[in-house]
């Protein structure tokens, strides 16, 4: 079993990812979806989160990612960014979706300087907007951002386009297609439901259960 498959199985086992083809979930965007991902659950499982961090470190090494500061997206990316930074003995920051309206009105928490190279850490990639917003905020402060890592990606066409437009590489530990295959193998869904899920993945805006 390869790493992407192991991560997919982990997410299904702890119910971080749930599938419901008959009563789909509605996202805040209004889109209906047969899949819902809540990777925040991982932090409650010490052994599972260790697996995730080890997988992240292997991904970083395999892809020769170069950076000197780890940037978590608020809030779900923060714990994973902290654990990665701790293992690599690197500075860590986190980036809000927008600046606070009180105090120092910071969007970026932690110390940064121009010329640094930041790695964005996200828990989930749907359209990629939160990760890319973090990358843009850092670039505006003179920080170089070329890569983002995430636990899971829905592999939506919009996300692929958004990352390409921003000239940021997105690396995920596991992906939608791998998870759907694992869901069939483990008996979470059948072949008919698998085809419906794949149809959603290709065109989520027009998908119907």
From Swiss-Prot:
Any idea of its EC number? 2.4.2.10
Q: Does the keyword Transferase apply?
A: yes
Cofactor dependence: Mg(2+)
Q: In which residues is orotate bound?
A: 126
Catalytic reactions on record: orotidine 5'-phosphate + diphosphate = orotate + 5-phospho-alpha-D-ribose 1-diphosphate
Q: Which PROSITE patterns match?
A: PUR_PYR_PR_TRANSFER
Could you mention a single GO BP entry for this protein?
UMP biosynthetic process
Q: Which InterPro entries match?
A: OPRT, Or_phspho_trans_dom, PRibTrfase_dom, PRTase-like
Q: Does the keyword Oxidoreductase apply?
A: no
Pathway linked to the protein: Pyrimidine metabolism; UMP biosynthesis via de novo pathway; UMP from orotate: step 1/2
**One Pfam family recorded for the sequence:** Pribosyltran
Q: What does this protein do?
A: Catalyzes the transfer of a ribosyl phosphate group from 5-phosphoribose 1-diphosphate to orotate, leading to the formation of orotidine monophosphate (OMP).
Descriptive protein name:
Orotate phosphoribosyltransferase
This protein's species is: Coxiella burnetii (strain RSA 493 / Nine Mile phase I)
- Gene responsible for this protein: pyrE
